[in-house]
Amino acid sequence: MVDVKLLLINTLTEEFNLPVIQQGSMSMDEDYPESFFTFWNNTTTDAAFYDDTETETIWDFDLNYYSDDPTSVNTILLEAKTLLKGVGFIVDGSGYDVMSDEKTHTGRGINLLFIERK
């Protein structure tokens, strides 16, 4: 069985060498890194059953990329999409704009699914 959160974090960290932060875990007085990813696990839904036991779980994540370099926001997120598809994540579309709490940063997000087979 795969640790899906660790797969997400490690894949992004190894490729981009940027912080990968669980959404909401930064303190209010903590400075934003120049560029970073955040993620949030929306749901984990059992999807397939055999003999009254779940055999598949669908992990649903939001992945956001923030940067003080607006030109990188689209390109890095699309690179992350390709990378994550290569390790088994399902990614539909090219993303959406996300709000930033800092005027210096812009953000873009994508939705990820991962089917964990048990």
Language model: regions and residue ranges:
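A generic structural signal for solvent-exposed, polar alpha-helical segments
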Residues: 42-45, 56, 95
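Oligomerization/assembly interface segments of phage tail-like spikes and tubes
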Residues: 55-68, 105-116
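Small/polar-rich, solvent-exposed N-terminal microdomains that initiate assembly or binding
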Residues: 1-50, 71, 76, 102
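Compositionally biased, intrinsically disordered low-complexity segments enriched in polar/Pro/Gly
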Residues: 1, 30, 50, 55, ...
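Short C-terminal domain-edge/linker segments immediately following a structured domain
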Residues: 52-54, 67-73, 92-97
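Acidic-leaning, charged glycine-interspersed low-complexity segments
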Residues: 78-118
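Short intrinsically disordered coil segments
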Residues: 52-58, 78-81
